[in-house]
Swiss-Prot record:
NCBIfam families linked: acyl_carrier
Entry comment describing in which tissues the protein is expressed: Roots, leaves and seeds.
Transmembrane intervals: none
UniProt function note: Carrier of the growing fatty acid chain in fatty acid biosynthesis.
Key words, A-Z: Chloroplast, Fatty acid biosynthesis, Fatty acid metabolism, Lipid biosynthesis, Lipid metabolism, Phosphopantetheine, Phosphoprotein, Plastid, Transit peptide
Domain of life: Eukaryota
UniProt protein name: Acyl carrier protein 2, chloroplastic
A GO cellular component entry from the record: chloroplast
Subcellular location: Plastid, Chloroplast
Gene: ACL1.2
PANTHER family found in the cross-reference section: ACYL CARRIER PROTEIN, ACYL CARRIER PROTEIN 2, CHLOROPLASTIC-RELATED
Length: 130
């Protein structure tokens, strides 16, 4: 059984469905007009990404834990391994995030975190479930 939790969900592109109209004219042929229409309304946008403020806080904590320069470029997409974190560093980062945000991260969840964004999403979800 699958479940999704979060404040919102984002769909970037809507699948399209095709429809057609055929017209018979006096000539012995048929002309078909194809039209593609979106299945979802264009204005619908849902997102499950953590707020930018949360990503910034998590980035700052990660930079501090790894003793990175203050001006080091760390974004939500940055993987811990790309900035020199090994498995022990990742455990220490998760422990610091738990302490800083007052949440408890299950071990199996902690092992799945590979990016700043994933950590921020997890912390935000845990705070909402408090």
């Amino acid at each position: 059984m699958a479940s999704i939790t979060g404040s919102s969900v984002s769909f970037k592109c809507a699948p399209l469905q095709s429809s057609f109209n055929s017209k018979n004219y006096a000539l012995k042929s048929s002309v078909t007009f194809w039209r593609r229409t979106p299945v979802m309304p264009r204005g619908l946008s849902v997102s499950c990404a953590a707020k930018p403020e949360m990503v910034t806080k998590v980035s700052d904590i990660v930079k501090s834990q790894l003793a990175l320069a203050e001006d080091a470029k760390v974004t939500g997409e940055t993987k811990f391994s790309e900035i020199g974190a090994d498995s022990l560093d990742t455990v220490e980062i998760v422990m610091k995030l738990e302490e800083e945000f007052g949440v408890t991260v299950e071990e199996e969840n902690a092992q799945t975190i590979t990016t700043i964004q994933e950590a921020a999403d997890m912390i935000e979800a845990l705070q909402q479930n408090k």
